């Protein structure tokens, strides 16, 4: 018999499980949620798993405990665990730290009101809302509204208490629901909220555990798992060729165990439905190949037996082992060229485009690594350039908008490299973005060619970077340049622009349309005809082709100097450019894909060979990648992580979700989906795999995807300023160092 000792869970947890077992209750009653009707795949648990990559990229479903939705009879929201963030997406966080009183722990409401949004999948209407909290001092008022409907006004006692509120049929909505809490005074401490089906409260219902993660003793060994809840559900993106790996343990009694997977709009498919004898541990290796690249609801449940008597040990999603190419020798030098306002869909590695970029395309096929899903840190230059140079997101480096200043102590790639004796150089007329970074940067040379009378063309940028390389006389160097070709004004290039528009040139648009003209178009003061649109877009496309000529000159210049083999080049954009796809032009007007989906290509002989990587990456990953390529340790303040391991692995990678922000707006990007919250808090959801122009709004059609991104948005909003990918993981895949987990 296995000995079971729970650590890290409240004593009420075991009592709850025993009570449920005595009452004969399983994971969920018929009124709470129907059991999946699908039968198990015949060989679901018998399929022989390939050699799995235990040390490689994986999804740690245990460390991501905050992402699981917890159920007893109904949904449980425990405030003492970071998982409650899934239900709180308010821009101004009303919640404060933890408070422990009389052996119970809760979270303090630091405002007089808070809003929670939660999913509901029950099949009947009548339910009850159970609020467990500490009033702080007697006499506080608590008012509750659900989906805009008043539920109850109550006066709180001084200590811990349980307030039960019947919910009439029709108040709860299948799908997303909004719960509004209003308190007359600050300081109430919330332990948990439970939304359960049925009218009556079972007698002596104990309070739920504050976390699904607990340590158990198995045959004298301590292991960690998910336990204590009859049903656990997590929205998760399944990687290509992924395998679910988990050990199911039954402790003092037998239990029936289920594992199911449900893709959006599809019936749940049972991967496991089995009775497991008491005191046993069964390793489970379940193929998820059928769900590759899909967002699914993964569910562990205990339909029969005590939930406290079952532990799901070390649940993970692993990939098959894959070959990995040898890590290259440290690059001697490195160059970054940022093409301001360059749309990803203007390069042939990203889309079928009319724009001619033979130099970029040829180099990408020969020595390039193209990241096809790159999320800009921001749709505006100052925040994005700061992220490209620092490896941090806007909330961390401090430049949230166009007027912000950099936070003191922000790491900068120029300073990191200079400490190792590497000469650093910046070239570009990007003073609007780059001048504000000077207080924390270390540039040996800083050139603004237009202001220096050397021309504002990208040819001048390339020449000055190559001149800087010449002056190093064999010493290590790093050069960063900004080319303005795709930014307004869109300049006419004789013999190039004609590839896309050969006239006549309307004076209303001219041959150098700037931001004033774009504003006039948006405001309706400049009426656009098909010919004028052709002229405007032809000028932009001609600028991109001219940029390609400059890129070609850079690569030829490096080769002629004998530097091409040991000088990787990174080409990327700070943001994209809009042409009325969503009611505006230029950039900085929103978080849509034409602005935040940007190109990122690494050109490195011996490392790149034309491969494309579809895992989502970020501007914040650029600095740690630069430092890693040059053989140096990453500054611990950097928030992103090196992309070199992703490049070296000759196989799929784990799904990642990356953010972008600008002022109060933000967006979250997965490989196929894009969740956007605008300046006013309005949500949008797009499937960019089938709708790259983001014309079809899916928020009300894809409930699982909406819940997935709301979950991640709550975590993101609470911790974006301090996120550290190397130790915390990504928003959708947490690591052991995820600091709030220690609360």
Predicted region positions:
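Basic, alpha-helical nucleic-acid-binding regions used in initiation and control of genome expression
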Residues: 140, 161-163
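Bacterial N-terminal signal peptides
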Residues: 10-21
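Short strand-turn-strand beta-turns centered on an Asx-Gly dipeptide
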Residues: 144-153, 262-265, 273
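Short proline/glycine- and polar residue-rich coil/turn motifs
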Residues: 154-161, 169-173, 274-280, 290
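Aromatic-lined ligand-binding clefts that engage carbohydrates, nucleic acids, or primary amines
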Residues: 125-147, 179-181
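Extracellular and analogous surface-interaction loops
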Residues: 110, 114-125, 167-171, 230-242, ...
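Bacterial N-terminal signal peptides that target proteins for export
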Residues: 1-12
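Catalytic domains that recognize anionic headgroups
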Residues: 23-93, 100, 135-137, 177, ...
């Amino acid at each position: 018999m296995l000995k079971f000792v729970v650590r890290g869970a409240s004593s009420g947890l075991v009592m709850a499980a025993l009570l449920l077992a005595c009452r004969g209750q399983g994971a969920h009653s018929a009124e709470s949620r129907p059991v999946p009707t699908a039968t198990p795949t015949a060989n679901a648990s018998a399929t022989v798993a390939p050699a799995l990559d235990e040390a490689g990229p994986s999804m740690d479903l245990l460390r991501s405990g905050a992402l699981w939705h917890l159920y007893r009879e109904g949904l449980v929201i425990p405030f003492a665990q970071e998982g409650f963030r899934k239900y709180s997406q308010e821009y101004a966080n009303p919640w404060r730290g933890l408070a422990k009183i009389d052996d119970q722990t809760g979270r303090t409401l630091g405002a007089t009101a808070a809003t929670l949004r939660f999913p509901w999948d029950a099949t009947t209407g009548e339910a009850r809302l159970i609020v467990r909290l500490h009033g702080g001092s007697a006499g506080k008022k608590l008012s509750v509204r659900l989906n805009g409907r008043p539920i109850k006004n109550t006066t709180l006692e001084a200590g811990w208490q349980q307030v039960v509120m019947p919910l009439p049929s029709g108040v709860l909505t299948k799908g997303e629901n909004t719960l509004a809490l209003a308190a007359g005074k600050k300081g109430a401490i919330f332990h948990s909220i439970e939304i359960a089906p049925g009218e009556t409260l079972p007698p002596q219902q104990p309070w739920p555990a504050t976390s699904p993660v607990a340590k158990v003793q198995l045959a004298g060994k301590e292991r960690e798992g998910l336990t204590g809840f009859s049903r656990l559900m997590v929205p998760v993106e399944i990687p290509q060729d992924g395998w679910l790996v988990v050990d199911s343990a039954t402790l003092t009694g037998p239990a029936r165990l289920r594992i199911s997977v449900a893709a959006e709009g599809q019936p749940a498919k049972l991967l496991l439905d089995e009775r497991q004898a008491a005191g046993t541990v069964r390793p489970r290796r379940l193929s998820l190949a059928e769900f590759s690249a899909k967002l699914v609801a993964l569910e562990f449940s205990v339909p029969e037996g005590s939930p406290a008597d079952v532990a799901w040990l070390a649940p993970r999603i692993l990939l098959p082992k894959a070959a990995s190419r040898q890590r290259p020798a440290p690059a001697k030098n490195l160059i970054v060229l940022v093409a301001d306002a360059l749309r990803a869909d203007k390069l042939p590695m990203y889309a079928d485009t009319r724009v001619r970029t033979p130099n970029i395309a040829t180099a990408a096929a020969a020595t390039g690594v193209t990241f096809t899903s790159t999320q800009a840190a921001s749709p505006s230059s100052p925040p994005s350039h700061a992220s490209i140079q620092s490896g941090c997101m806007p909330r961390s480096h401090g430049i949230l908008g166009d007027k912000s200043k950099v936070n003191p102590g922000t790491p900068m790639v120029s300073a990191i490299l200079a400490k190792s004796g590497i000469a650093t150089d910046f070239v570009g007329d990007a003073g609007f973005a780059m001048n504000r970074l000077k207080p924390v940067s270390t540039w040996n040379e800083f050139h603004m060619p237009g202001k220096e009378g050397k021309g504002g063309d990208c040819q001048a940028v390339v020449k000055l970077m190559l001149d800087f390389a010449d002056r190093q006389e064999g010493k290590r160097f790093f050069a960063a340049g900004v080319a303005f070709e795709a930014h307004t004004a869109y300049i006419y290039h004789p013999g190039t622009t004609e590839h896309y528009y050969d006239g006549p040139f309307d004076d209303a648009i001219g041959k150098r349309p700037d931001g004033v003209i774009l504003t006039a178009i948006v405001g309706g003061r400049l009426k656009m005809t098909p010919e004028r649109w052709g002229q405007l877009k032809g000028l932009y496309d001609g600028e991109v082709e001219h940029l390609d000529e400059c890129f070609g000159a850079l690569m030829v210049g490096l080769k002629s100097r004998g530097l091409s083999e040991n000088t990787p080049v990174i080409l990327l954009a700070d943001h994209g450019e809009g042409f009325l796809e969503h009611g505006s032009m230029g950039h900085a007007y929103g978080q849509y894909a034409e602005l935040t989906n940007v190109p990122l290509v690494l050109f490195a002989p011996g490392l790149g060979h034309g491969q494309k990587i579809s895992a989502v990456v970020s501007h914040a990953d650029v600095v740690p990648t630069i430092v890693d390529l040059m053989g140096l340790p990453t500054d611990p303040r950097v928030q992103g992580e090196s992309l070199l391991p992703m490049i070296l692995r000759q196989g799929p990678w784990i799904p990642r979700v990356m953010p972008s922000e600008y002022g109060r707006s933000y967006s979250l990007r997965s490989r196929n989906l894009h969740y956007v919250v605008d300046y006013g808090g309005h949500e949008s959801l797009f499937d960019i795999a089938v709708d790259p122009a983001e014309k079809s709004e899916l928020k009300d059609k894809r409930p699982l995807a909406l819940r997935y991104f709301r979950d991640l948005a709550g975590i993101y909003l609470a911790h974006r300023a301090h996120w550290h990918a190397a130790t915390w993981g990504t928003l959708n895949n947490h690591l052991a160092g995820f600091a709030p987990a220690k609360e």
